[in-house]
Amino acid sequence: MLKGSITALVTPFDREGAFDEKAFRAFVNWQIEEGTKGLVPVGTTGETPTLSHDEHKRVIEVCIEVAAGRVPVIAGAGSNNTVEAIELAQHAEKAGADAVLVVTPYYNKPNQRGLYEHFSRVVRSISIPLVIYNIPGRSIIDMTPETMGALVRDCKNIVGVKDATGKIERVSEQRAICGKEFIQLSGEDATALGFNAHGGVGCISVTSNIAPRLCAEFQEACQAGNFAKALELQDRLMPLHKALFLEPNPSGPKYALSRLGRIENVLRSPMVTIEAATAEKIDHAMKHAGLIN
């Protein structure tokens, strides 16, 4: 169910900074029409830290409504407070999400026993699948393959991981410990080719916000074992993968989407719009990928 190109959706805001539901509905529909195989609302790219709980829940509800079962919706339900994560996960299930994505707790830096406790409590509070989001670059702490394996062994609804460690060897290590059926999704567009070669089955992608069709074709080539075609697509996409992260995400993707006329280029403080030099590099990368003239 969870494989291929899965988009970590931006949350559009209007010029007054409010959630732009109309733009979001059109954006979700466009993603599906372009071949995206799954949707992740209210993750990091969705500016979750600056959404109210009501907004967080509304974004999920709208995404599920527009998707209408055409592709799975993996709702963000992360928090560094276990009770809050449980409440968000339960709302996602009630709203009709197919799975939840739960990030490793950030800032308070739990140890491995704390990580086990957090995830086991969240997953036991719901009946839908849970995907672990391991991103040491933002959370500081790194869930080890051994802790992940213990969770998979003890909690049948922990079905996969979004791995943003940047360590390609982790795919093989987690495959050995968690089993070949454990779903491993890359959390980094630029390394997704190698990730898939090691046994990954897709990517929760930022770049697919802007280039959904190309990212879908890239993942399809990987899953078919056609790595020559995947490499050709990677060559087209790599400048965009890099340019979108020249400034903190999602400032790059929101600018690029505004260039495509999909959303307003509006972020919530403390996030700010990109500088002119960065915009020029993103424009160049979009031209290289064939997205603009």
Curated annotation (Swiss-Prot):
E.C. no: 4.3.3.7
Keywords: Amino-acid biosynthesis, Cytoplasm, Diaminopimelate biosynthesis, Lyase, Lysine biosynthesis, Schiff base
Swiss-Prot/TrEMBL site (Part of a proton relay during catalysis) positions: T44, Y107
InterPro entries recorded: Aldolase_TIM, DapA, DapA-like, Schiff_base-form_aldolases_AS
Enzyme class: lyase
Protein's UniProt keywords contain Membrane: no
Active site per the UniProt annotation: Y133 (proton donor/acceptor), K162 (schiff-base intermediate with substrate)
Subcellular location field: Cytoplasm
Family to which this protein belongs: Belongs to the DapA family.
Function recorded in the entry: Catalyzes the condensation of (S)-aspartate-beta-semialdehyde [(S)-ASA] and pyruvate to 4-hydroxy-tetrahydrodipicolinate (HTPA).
Name of the protein in question: 4-hydroxy-tetrahydrodipicolinate synthase
